[in-house]
């Protein structure tokens, strides 16, 4: 709350344009209890940036759930789109659906291969988003030990990359966000691309790695190869006859989790349309696909509900 004696003109006068934009967005968001979009990095600090256009500025859009007296879980959401676009129904719709269950949603606009970016730019954006939510947990009513990552299709590949390539943060950084761990506390992988090998999605691989990636890069970003005992618990689902992203991707990640004793659930459903999302639209979300009920049951087991 701003004290009644504060002179806003003086406050604004000592702010940089970037600080004013972020501060105004935060204040308006808190007053409206609505979504706001914030840059993930301060102006000029995006690693590997190719410019200052909208496509060069990764952002986080907040979808706060109704607040309670206790800190609540949060889901960082990575929409799919083959690393060439971002599917709104796999971002905002997921966040609004989870809001009804008391889970805060944070949707990431990450950099894309269609705009000239390649790995590791996308991973940097996803990791920064988890760090940002953890660093700002108290301000948003988030439990810093219940921050998940959720992704669909190529967004699922990015989520699985963070699940297997996270770090503990840089304790020496002057940026408090960078001091935070990027490890999610759990993951949700929806018809996810997992492998960069034979059963990968060709467009996602090309947009992420370019035309002629090295064998080492293909191995490293085939995330079934990178599961360890430190990989967080994960909920995995696919449609049996998905023609774009074969179920072998989900099965490979589940098999790796089993081998390394990582808690997981794997659900394979009848059907074939790729990219179905919830199978229902806001605001009512009538008759969603059964995977949503299975996810909510699993989240309850994880003590997220």
What are the language-model segments listed below?
Residues 43, 176, 192-226, 232:
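Mobile cap/lid helix-loop segments that gate and shape the active-site cleft of serine hydrolases
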Residues 79-84, 240:
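Active-site glycine-rich loops that stabilize anionic/oxyanionic intermediates
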Residues 87-88, 93-94, 108-144, 280-288:
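Catalytic nucleophile-loop/oxyanion-hole region of alpha/beta-hydrolase
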Residues 235-238, 242:
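Short beta-strand/loop motif that positions the catalytic acidic residue
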């Amino acid at each position: 709350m701003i004290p009644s004696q504060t002179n806003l003109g003086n406050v604004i006068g000592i702010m940089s344009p970037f600080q004013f934009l972020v501060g105004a967005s935060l204040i308006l968001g808190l007053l409206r209890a609505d979504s706001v979009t914030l840059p993930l990095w301060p102006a000029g600090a995006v690693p590997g940036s190719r410019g200052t256009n909208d496509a060069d500025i990764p952002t986080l859009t907040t979808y706060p759930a109704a607040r309670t007296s206790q800190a609540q879980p949060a889901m960082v959401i990575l929409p799919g789109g083959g690393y060439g676009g971002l599917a709104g129904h796999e971002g905002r719709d997921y966040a609004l659906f989870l809001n009804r269950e008391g889970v805060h949603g944070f949707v990431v606009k990450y950099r894309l291969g269609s705009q000239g970016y390649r790995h590791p730019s996308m991973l940097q954006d996803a990791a920064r988003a988890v760090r940002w939510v953890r660093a700002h947990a108290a301000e948003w009513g988030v439990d810093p030990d219940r921050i998940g990552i959720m992704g669909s299709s190529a967004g699922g590949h990015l989520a699985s990359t963070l699940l297997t390539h996270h770090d503990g943060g840089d304790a020496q950084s002057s940026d408090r966000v960078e001091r935070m761990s990027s490890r999610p506390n759990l993951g949700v992988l929806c018809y996810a691309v997992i492998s960069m090998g034979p059963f990968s999605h060709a467009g996602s691989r090309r947009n992420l790695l370019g035309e002629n990636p090295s064998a080492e890069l293909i191995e490293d970003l085939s995330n079934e190869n990178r599961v360890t005992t430190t990989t967080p618990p994960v909920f995995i689902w696919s449609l049996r006859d998905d023609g774009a992203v074969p179920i072998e991707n989900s099965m490979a990640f589940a098999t790796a989790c089993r081998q390394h004793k990582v808690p997981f659930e794997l659900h394979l459903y009848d059907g074939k349309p790729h990219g179905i999302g919830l199978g229902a639209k806001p605001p009512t979300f009538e008759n969603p696909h059964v995977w949503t009920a299975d996810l909510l049951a699993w989240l309850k087991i994880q003590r997220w509900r």
